[in-house]
């Protein structure tokens, strides 16, 4: 597979290094990134994946948050395990057709800790890309580990990432986190599609007024400073959080959530796929 981002500075990768097996035809790869944990990055990944699938696209999620995976549980895959096809792994498929590969699908029990060092984690992410039979996929979303460290670098050097969605929350040090993400994106020559702010407010059940529990959002100022699009601001929604814990994100997610984010992902031009 070739990619226009292959001439990235600060960790240059040639197209030939994006190893893809002959049973995978992934057209676009989108990384969902946050500066720290606890901001709902995995939920945003799941929401975008669900909405893309509802629009008729073939969707996959590569869970690169190896030590803190939550994607399988969100998509109702607790207790399920990946199977093999020759030397390749087969992703698990959700009720509504979203393909998922995650470290939790390799463990005997989903509560077992993943006590792997950095190089092993990096190797697992590369295997999730090159040794998984993804089949035809229009959009592969990568649920990144928190931060912009070694594991994030592994993703950008091992996968032909076409765009980045940044997830923040109002209590984040938004400016610093966005600055780090922007710097990484520039060094890896990958465009940032925009920012999603999660937990922006809570809606009063009586009058519908938006209450900013964590204070006034700084997102508009930060987005303007770095010339980034705001892709959405999501409320705190306890019912939806409970549905994710029950593995019901695909049925519980309101129709039309994050329309700007989904449209930004859809607007990415597919890169050429070459048989390995």
Region spans (language model):
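C-terminal lobe/tail of nucleotide-utilizing enzymes
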Residues: 1-17, 182-276
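Phosphate-binding P-loop
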Residues: 21-27
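Residue-level signature of catalytic and energy-coupling elements of molecular machines
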Residues: 26, 37, 63, 71, ...
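Walker A/P-loop phosphate-binding motif and the immediately C-terminal alpha-helix
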Residues: 29-65, 182
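Phosphate-binding loop that captures ATP/GTP phosphates
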Residues: 58-60, 64-110, 122
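Glycine-rich phosphate-binding loops of nucleotide-dependent enzymes
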Residues: 101, 125, 144, 157, ...
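Phosphate-binding/switch loop-helix module in NTP-utilizing enzymes
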Residues: 107-155
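Conserved Switch II/interswitch segment of TRAFAC-class P-loop GTPases
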Residues: 135-139, 148, 160-181
